[in-house]
Every structure is written in structure tokens, then in C-alpha cells.
């Protein structure tokens, strides 16, 4: 699984970096030629894209290193750090756009030949949609937080390019403040995306539990298994591609130790079939030692 994960995530990071670099060169020319503040917004965003995608590429390679004596749970948390760094990059670009947009609202400047800007923006829009589609497929296959953060960023780029097209069209017909107004709106949306991304990264670093639906699946697998009378103390988290799952099984007091171990092994394999690559720890408890109030399963 780790080889497939690493290959897909690395390809996603390389594709994002290559596309952002190519679009940056095109946008530099378009901004120089038209003077559009909306295109400047897109240019700044491309700079952030490159920095974020390069960070992803380096961090993903580090996160895929196997566990060692100093990092016995692996290096998957590096992905969350990359997502947090991206949120900081994006917040900085949003603040820059705020200042530039306000300045152009106060003193609007007519742009040169909006048609060039429209052509460049259409190219950027098509390329970004293709990239986001590929990233969404990678996220569905790997659940990589770093690629998900990158995808959220490029999804905001799709909306941004659409807004730029409208702004350039309005400017073409003489409404010069539209350029700055749309750039300001883009900045607000980018900042919102950055804050959401940062929140998700922090939650991962704080070892947030797996989603309720996944935990319920684990509970259903465990409690329906022959030989298991009940279960409690389910604890879960995720680091990079690896889910960490801990659970206590409740078994009959007179069940031989070898048989209890065999049942636990079967339950572990069933969980791994549903969540491949997980790190599963199962503890067996005799029913008589489990407090009555602890037998009711809750998602904790």
C-alpha cells in the first residue's frame, strides 16, 4: 500500500508544481501587458501554489520514510505540518490581495487590452480543472491530507479564475472598479480556505479521532464477530495514510487464552480488510472484569 500511496501522492505533487510554474510565466506576461489587479491576484496565487506544492513534494517524501527508533509511529504527521504551512502561505497572499485591491478601489486604473487577460484566464481555468480532477482521484485513493490541502487550494483557484473572467469582462465595458472588487472578494475566499485548511491540519496534529462513519464500521465489525460478547474503549487517529485503531474486546470468562487470541486475530484481520494498512491493537477482557456502565459502546 505504501508504494502505491507514495507513487500517487508524489505524482500529484509533481503535477501541481509543474502546472503552477507554467501558469506563473503566462500570468506574469498577462499582468505586465494588461495591468489588471485581478491577474496580479492570480499571479500571487500561483507563486503561493508553487511554494505550497514544492513543500508538499518534499514533505510527502519525508513522511513516507519507514518508522525508526526515534519515530516509532512513522513520519506521517509531516503531512499535517505541510498543510499547516500551506495555510500560512495562503493567508499571506490573501492579505496582500486585500491591500492591493483596496488601493485600486480608491484609485482605479484602466487596464490595457482585457482580451489578453481573458485568454490567459481561460487557459488557467481549464488547466486547473484538470489538475483538481486528478487530485480528487488521488485523495479518494490515498486519503492524503497533504494532497487534500493542495486540492482545496486549487479548487479555490477555479472559483478565482471564474471571478477574474467576470471582472475582466466588466472592465472591458468600462467598469474599472470591478477588477479591484472581484480581487477583494477572491482574497476573502482565499483567506477562508486557508483558515479551514489550517484548522484541519491542527486537528490532525492533535490526533482527532476518525470520522464517526468509520468508527461505526469498526464497531459493527467487532460486535458482530462470533466469540465477542462486547467491546469498549475504541480509540482511533490517523497519521498520513495510516489509521491507528485500538479497542478492547469483551469475551466469556471461561474462554481459553489460545481461543481468545485466535478470535482477536480474526477481528484484526477483518478490520484490516476494511481499512488496509492500519495499525490495529486489540486487548481482550473477560466479561466479569468489565464494569457494567462501561459495556455500553460510545463513540469517544
From Swiss-Prot:
<feature type="binding site">
    <location>
        <position position="157"/>
    </location>
    <ligand>
        <name>Zn(2+)</name>
    </ligand>
</feature>
<dbReference type="GO" id="GO:0006882">
    <property type="term" value="P:intracellular zinc ion homeostasis"/>
</dbReference>
<keyword id="KW-1003">Cell membrane</keyword>
<comment type="function">
    <text>Divalent metal cation transporter which exports Zn(2+), Cd(2+) and possibly Fe(2+). May be involved in zinc and iron detoxification by efflux.</text>
</comment>
<keyword id="KW-0410">Iron transport</keyword>
<keyword id="KW-0813">Transport</keyword>
<keyword id="KW-0812">Transmembrane</keyword>
<feature type="binding site">
    <location>
        <position position="153"/>
    </location>
    <ligand>
        <name>Zn(2+)</name>
    </ligand>
</feature>
<keyword id="KW-0862">Zinc</keyword>
<keyword id="KW-0406">Ion transport</keyword>
<feature type="binding site">
    <location>
        <position position="45"/>
    </location>
    <ligand>
        <name>Zn(2+)</name>
    </ligand>
</feature>
<dbReference type="InterPro" id="IPR027470">
    <property type="entry name" value="Cation_efflux_CTD"/>
</dbReference>
<dbReference type="GO" id="GO:0015341">
    <property type="term" value="F:zinc efflux antiporter activity"/>
</dbReference>
<dbReference type="InterPro" id="IPR027469">
    <property type="entry name" value="Cation_efflux_TMD_sf"/>
</dbReference>
<dbReference type="InterPro" id="IPR050291">
    <property type="entry name" value="CDF_Transporter"/>
</dbReference>
<dbReference type="GO" id="GO:0015093">
    <property type="term" value="F:ferrous iron transmembrane transporter activity"/>
</dbReference>
<protein>
    <recommendedName>
        <fullName>Cation-efflux pump FieF</fullName>
    </recommendedName>
</protein>
<feature type="transmembrane region" description="Helical">
    <location>
        <begin position="156"/>
        <end position="176"/>
    </location>
</feature>
<comment type="subunit">
    <text>Homodimer.</text>
</comment>
<dbReference type="InterPro" id="IPR036837">
    <property type="entry name" value="Cation_efflux_CTD_sf"/>
</dbReference>
<feature type="transmembrane region" description="Helical">
    <location>
        <begin position="82"/>
        <end position="102"/>
    </location>
</feature>
<comment type="similarity">
    <text>Belongs to the cation diffusion facilitator (CDF) transporter (TC 2.A.4) family. FieF subfamily.</text>
</comment>
<feature type="transmembrane region" description="Helical">
    <location>
        <begin position="178"/>
        <end position="198"/>
    </location>
</feature>
<dbReference type="Pfam" id="PF16916">
    <property type="entry name" value="ZT_dimer"/>
</dbReference>
<feature type="binding site">
    <location>
        <position position="49"/>
    </location>
    <ligand>
        <name>Zn(2+)</name>
    </ligand>
</feature>
<dbReference type="GO" id="GO:0015086">
    <property type="term" value="F:cadmium ion transmembrane transporter activity"/>
</dbReference>
<dbReference type="GO" id="GO:0005886">
    <property type="term" value="C:plasma membrane"/>
</dbReference>
<dbReference type="Pfam" id="PF01545">
    <property type="entry name" value="Cation_efflux"/>
</dbReference>
<keyword id="KW-1133">Transmembrane helix</keyword>
<keyword id="KW-0479">Metal-binding</keyword>
<keyword id="KW-0997">Cell inner membrane</keyword>
<keyword id="KW-0472">Membrane</keyword>
<dbReference type="GO" id="GO:0046872">
    <property type="term" value="F:metal ion binding"/>
</dbReference>
<keyword id="KW-0864">Zinc transport</keyword>
<dbReference type="InterPro" id="IPR002524">
    <property type="entry name" value="Cation_efflux"/>
</dbReference>
<keyword id="KW-0408">Iron</keyword>
<feature type="transmembrane region" description="Helical">
    <location>
        <begin position="24"/>
        <end position="44"/>
    </location>
</feature>
<feature type="transmembrane region" description="Helical">
    <location>
        <begin position="114"/>
        <end position="134"/>
    </location>
</feature>
<dbReference type="InterPro" id="IPR023783">
    <property type="entry name" value="Cation_efflux_FieF"/>
</dbReference>
